[in-house]
Amino acid sequence: MNLMRTAMLLAFMTVLFMAVGYVIGGRGGMMIALVIAAGMNFFSYWNSDRMVLRMYRAQEVDERSAPEYYGIVRDLAKNAGLPMPRVYVIDSPQPNAFATGRNPENAAVAASTGLLHSLSYEEVAGVMAHELAHIQYRDTLTMTMTATLAGAISMLGNFAFFFGGNRENNNPLGFIGVLIAMIVAPLAAALVQMAISRTREYSADRRGAEICGNPLWLSSALRKIAGAAHVVHNPDAERNPATAHMFIINPLSGERMDNLFSTHPNTENRVVALERMAREMSTGSTAPVRPDNAVRKSRSVPRTGWGRGGSEPPKGPWS
């Protein structure tokens, strides 16, 4: 199902490229756009994960540089029966996280320093379990490729304004066609992102709760992240809005409503579903993830101290 969805999305993106190419240069422009789209599809499949990580200047960490964060992901991946993904930290005060990669064997998870600062051990585990669920369901291929292609289509729509209205080109639609392309192409690209059903977030929430062993860990994390995400701005996400749907909570300011134009379900609806799941679960489908040595250390996140100084008291029942 996910492979079919990915193919349909890529086909639609290709049609968008061809349509804008037609506006810019007629049939010749359409054929050039087709070649460019085919090349981008190929490139995105192999490189879109690296592109997204580079957009956010993500820093890869390991067991030595971020032992507790890395250990959480390692234990959760084992619970889920997944290969160990690459683990990254994003230097951003906004609490958020995402996963990327074309398949479970080539996947990566990334959490912001803001998330690692403000959440307890259990809440971090709930968030990373959610991201691993996306990897397990292979949502990451669709999300990452859609992000890169949607951004490119928006740029191509703007490109049409400078080169599509010239009388000397082969544009059969004139300046009106260029204006339509400028408006429709970015809107259509955004709608494609929304076409990736928001129900995948509910599915990842449920599977993530199973992986970490406690739905309330994730519900508590979602409340904290949503409360901060629209107060603490994320400049990198604002510059790259096509990647917003990849995050566990929409990182863009002003995206609060569960409506047709939202990339994420309403957070409170997700929390209610998780709390209902918690009531239904007598025991977790997997053993809850617990640290071997439940004491946060200053080296847990590179150069950050993972949220508190050495004199600050421990937080959470894991401490």
UniProtKB/Swiss-Prot annotation:
The lineage of its organism: Bacteria, Pseudomonadati, Pseudomonadota, Alphaproteobacteria, Hyphomicrobiales. The chain crosses the membrane at residues 6-26, 28-48, 145-165, 172-192. It is an enzyme of class 3 (hydrolase). NCBIfam families: PRK01345.1, PRK03001.1. Its EC number is 3.4.24.-. This is Protease HtpX homolog. InterPro entries: HtpX_protease, Pept_M48_protease_HtpX, Peptidase_M48. The active site is at E131. Its cofactor is Zn(2+). Binds 1 zinc ion per subunit.
